Regions:
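N-terminal loops that bind phosphate or other acidic moieties
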Residues: 16-200
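Short, Lys/Arg-enriched N-terminal segments with co-localized hydrophobic residues
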Residues: 1-19
Length: 200
């Protein structure tokens, strides 16, 4: 809910920006994610009650609460190290399949951005791609199986196509959010073939 507002607002990207985020901005984004997950945990759990275990929101919030406990170490780290630390914390604290999947996305992104104190749009696009690749491999999933990939893959493709077309970072992010929202709506029309939902 309110995906467009929360993501685009916290990024605050302008058309002419070449640097997308530095360490300080990454920490701000993580803070926003933590707050949004906490705010939406009951909604996420309600969704999970329908065809899942009914604990997704609570588990995810527990994981990001744990991330909050290590946040005081982030200012001394590079972006890659921050993302890797978050991934490891999520793997160790989020129950079920979600922890390894979210953790994999962060750890793959961390490996990609190892040593970097700034990232640009090309880094972000590649970060989305390695996250998708990691989740596909870890979850043995592909697009069209009613998973997070049905939002992530269209978002990546839309951002990449838009940014390559005219180099407008803000426009590209807007396109990515729109594609993700459309992907979320698409999942309502298909049958789950992964996870507990596939058994119902």
């Amino acid at each position: 809910r309110n995906l467009r507002g929360s993501f685009v607002r916290v990024m605050n990207i302008r058309k002419e920006d070449t640097t997308m985020a530095d360490v300080k901005k990454v920490i701000e984004i993580i803070d926003k994610i933590i707050a949004d997950v906490d705010e939406q945990k009951l909604f996420l759990t309600e969704l999970d009650n329908v065809i899942g275990d009914g604990d997704h929101g609570i588990n995810l919030a527990r994981g990001f609460d744990a991330v909050k406990t290590i946040e005081d170490t982030f200012e001394s780290k590079d972006i890659g190290a921050i993302l890797k630390a978050i991934g490891m914390k999520l793997v160790s604290t989020v129950g079920g399949a979600s922890g390894p999947l979210y953790g994999t996305a962060f750890m793959k992104s961390g490996a990609l951005l190892n040593g970097k104190t700034e990232m640009d749009m090309n880094d972000f696009i590649e970060m989305l791609q390695v996250s998708i690749d990691g989740i596909m491999k870890r979850g043995k999933a592909v697009k069209g199986e009613k998973t997070m990939l049905d939002a992530m893959i269209p978002a990546h493709d839309a951002i990449k196509a838009s940014y390559e077309a005219d180099g407008d970072a803000k426009k590209a992010l807007d396109a990515g959010v729109k594609a993700a929202e459309e992907g979320i709506e698409y999942t309502k029309t298909i049958i789950a073939t992964k996870g507990r939902a596939s058994c119902l």
